[in-house]
Amino acid sequence: MKKKLFGTDGVRGVANIYPMTTEIAMQLGRAAAHIFKKDHTRRHRIVIGKDTRLSGYMIENALVAGICSMGVDVLLVGPLPTPGIAFITSSMRADAGVVISASHNPYQDNGIKFFSADGFKLPDTTELEIEKLIFGNEIDSLRPVADEVGKAFRMDDAGGRYIVFLKNSFPQDLDLNGLKIVLDCANGAAYKVAPAVLEELGAEVVTLGVKPNGSNINAGCGSLYPESLAKAVKEHGAHLGMALDGDADRVIFVDEQGQEVDGDQIMAICSLDMMKQGKLAHNTLVSTVMSNMGLDIALRNAGGQVVKTAVGDRYVVEEMRRGGYNLGGEQSGHMIFLDYNTTGDGMVSALQLLAIMQRTGKPLSELAGVMTALPQVLINVRVASRQDINIVPEIARTVKAVEEKLADTGRVLIRYSGTEPLLRIMLEGQDEAEITGLAQEIADVIERHLGVRTKEQ
C-alpha cells in the first residue's frame, strides 16, 4: 500500500501548508500515541524534540495536544539533534520519540519523524498503521475520558545527558588537546551541545552558525556550504573544520588545506581503521548507490567489501541490522556507527574520525588519501510531478546513449529525491569533463520535458 503522508524520512513539507499543518500534526500525535500504547497497565510517554525553526513551536504544541488527548504523557526536550532524541527515547525507556525537523532543508520547511522505543526509525508497516488511523473513522472513539488524558513535562537536562553520551563514544585514553577545530552548527539543533563536547574533550573551537533566530537554519551555513567552512579554516589556521546540518544527523569535514572531505571519504577512513583493529563487523561497510566507486575499490583492496542499498539512511540501517554490520552511511555525511547509536549521528561520526587523527598523529589530508574518488557530477532538476522517465521516449533514448558511451568506465544514476521535488542526475566516470557534458545533455532533455534545472556543486 502506498503511503499518503510519510516519505523516506517522515512527513515533510512547507510549514503551515498541507501536510505540514497543525491539524495534521495533531492527528499524527493522536494516531501515534494510540499505536505506541502497548498496554493499559502503566503510564506511557513520548519524547518530543525539535531543531531551531520558527514553525517548530506551533507544530510541537499540536503534537503535544494530540498525544496527550490519547492518554499519553510527553517529555519535551527542546532543541536537540535528531540522534540525541533517539538516544533520549531509548535511555528514558520512552515508548517513542518524535523529531520536529526538516534536516538540511531551508527554514520554511519542517517535518515530523518518529523513533520507536529502541531508538530506531519506524518501519513502513507502522507508518502505514498511523496513516490508517488518521484517514479512518476509528480514532475519535478511542479517546480516553478526561481523568485519563496525558501530561506534558519539560526535560531540562536532555542536552547534558546527550553530551555525556557523546563523550563516552570517544576513547577514554585520548583527548582533543592540541587540535584547533572550526565547527559550523548550521544555526541548528546542535548549536549548544556540539561546541560543548569538543571543548570538554580539550579542543580549541572556533564556532560558526551558533546564533539561531528561527529563520537562519541552514542559511548559507552547515554541511551543504563547505566553502565558508574552508575559508574559516584557512583564516584561523585550524587543523580541520567540521560542519553539521540543521538537525546534526550528518557531518562533513574540511582538511587543513581547505579541501572538503565528504561522507564517502570519512567512511573509508573509519572502516579501514576499524578493519585494522578487527572491529568492522564482517569486514563490511554498508553504503548507498550514490557512493563513489572509489570507496568500493579502497575496501576491496584492503580485503573488505561494500554492500549497497537504496538512498536513505533508514535503508542503510535496515541492511546493517539485517546483516549484523556496524558501520554504514551516505556520501552526504549521514553515518551510522551502530556500536554507539541507532541512527545517523554527526557528532558520533566526527568523534570517531577525530580519534583516528589523534591516535595516528596524521593530518586529515593524509588520512583522506586512503581513497581515490572517481569524478562525479550531480545535477538536480526541479519537477512538478514524479513521472516515470522511462516512458518519455526522448529521455529514455538519451540516457541509454550515455550509458552505452560510458560502458564499463562509469555509470549513470537517476532518481527522485525522497524529501524534495527534485530529480537527481548523477554521473560517475574517469574523465570529469566528459561526464559533465553528458550529465548536462541528460539534464537538458529532462528540463525540457519535466522541470527547471539547478546545479549542485
UniProtKB/Swiss-Prot annotation:
Residues bearing PTM Phosphoserine: 103
Gene Ontology MF term list: magnesium ion binding; phosphoglucosamine mutase activity; phosphomannomutase activity
EC number: 5.4.2.10
Keywords: Isomerase, Magnesium, Metal-binding, Phosphoprotein
Domain of life: Bacteria
Entry's family note: Belongs to the phosphohexose mutase family.
Official protein name in the record: Phosphoglucosamine mutase
Originating organism: Syntrophotalea carbinolica (strain DSM 2380 / NBRC 103641 / GraBd1)
